[in-house]
Amino acid sequence: MSYEYSEKKIVAVLASNLEAGIALNVIGHLAVSMGAYADEDIMGRKVLTDNSGIDHTGISKYPFIITKVKPSRLKRLVDDARQEESLLLVDYPKQMLTTGHDDELAEEIAKVDNANIEYLGAVIYGDSKIVSELTGKFTLWK
């Protein structure tokens, strides 16, 4: 498998005011969604076999960086990323914390104008240059 490792990247951006437990929940949901909707090109080898013959499920072949920004900056990022059609954007609205079933979430989101949605996180995948232009000045999550 030959490819350019730095050609594309994945950047998760979390609201800087999240507690660690909520941040982990947000990133978990975002990562599952990203994996489900990304093209097959995002994945490296399906299986990695160790020296003992044990198979390990493969992971993304591109860098996955986790950052944080103020909630207002996160909102602008989501809006800006939506303008770049070549990017895959997955967002996590605050309503996901107060709803259970997917149908409940759909009902709650349908009641809110985009201008009033508060995002707790987002993941962007695509061309490294474009993703870096949008997220390059953000603080790494530590």
Regions found by a protein language model. Give the residues of each.
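Positively charged, small/polar-rich N-terminal and surface patches that mediate targeting and assembly
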Residues: 1-142
